[in-house]
Curated annotation (Swiss-Prot):
Pfam families: DUF5571 (PF17732), zf-CCCH_3 (PF15663). Residues 136-168, 298-322, 350-382 are annotated as: Disordered. InterPro entries: DUF5571, Znf-CCCH_3. The lineage of its organism: Eukaryota, Metazoa, Chordata, Craniata, Vertebrata. It comes from the Eukaryota. This is Uncharacterized protein C12orf50 homolog. It comes from Macaca fascicularis (Crab-eating macaque). One of its GO terms (biological process) is poly(A)+ mRNA export from nucleus.
Amino acid sequence: MEMQQNCSISCFWETQPLGCVKISCIFYHSKPRNINGLFLPPSSNITLQKESQEGIPLQTQSQEPLKPQENISRPIHHPLVLKTNFEEEEEVDEQNDASSLWTKTPEEIEEKRAIKEMCYKSGEYYRFHTPPDILSSKSMAPTAEKELEKPLENGSELQEGDSLTVPTKLSQYERQGEIKTSLHGKPKTDIAAFENGGGDCYVPQRVIFLGVDESEALTEEKEITISKCSNTKDNKDSPHPKRSLTTRLVPTTHVLNATENISMKCREDPSSMNDVQPVKKPHFKGVKKRKWIYDEPKNFPDSGMRRAVQTPSPQNKMSYHRNNKNRNAENASYIHVQRDAVRTVALNAPPHSRPMHGSYNKVHVNKEPKPNLSPDKYMSTSYNDSAWRKRIPFSKTYSKSGKIYPEPRRNGSK
């Protein structure tokens, strides 16, 4: 269109003396031009008309094919636009709901809420759920924990003397303390009763713990049954009931320290032998030490006695035997316990702390005859000594250990 309009405008350079020099000048030229030997005739109106006529059909031809294209491309219905951003749709819906709240009645609002709740419930139904077994176990777990906590708070359902009753819901530190303190009750079995004093006439005693971890105590302690080597042979001919005696091997320093405390208390106050008190050493860590204490006679020997446990005088034993046979049987069982306890001290004592011919031999032993007690009970001294040597290779025996319990004779002579 600009070319057609420009062709109707006369060229400015045509009025100049040199004329229009441009070959491709689009303006109207009334005069011919000669540009570098090229002759250009003047532009006429016919050409303008032709050009204008040619331009019009071109436009019509270009517009005609557009019409069928428009008819084809135009859809009958409005196009469906899909929105991928769902948040915007929700916001628009909320705005529409907010705008329509003013016009809706409360019944319609309640209906919409009910529909939304139903949709939410249906969505919850189709979601992933844990199986009911897990849910039931989760619900049962807190109830079981509560039931377990009740007897722990009351302390009534815990059995007396049962060392295996340990509360489950405790920390590791409290659990260790509970295991240690649970052994303070009365034992049920015969073996435990025999260790605590034996039979009906035992003194209730407490087990002493001196602050050792359970792992260390388990590694250090080795349980040895001596019933095969000592008690079975002794009890073959005796009418007393057979009872297996279990002893524990502990380090020598702990046994000696515990027995030294007992001997010091006996020296200061002889009546303290009948009292049951826990022995504690604050400056060392030890293992639990069971001590066997019985009713001692009031007449003690000379002050040179350093023994932890004394042998009872035979006169009192004979009176016990005459008065009560059961009491005499228990005292006879005490003899084995005391002899084994003293032997642990004598065998495990280090040489530099105890002299070879020390005060262990300074024991007041009444050598009067004992007709009612079988002498076979004293025969197990040498047999037990050899058994201790076999089972405890690191222990050192004394040459005069056999003189602690000499065999009494019928006539009373040595």
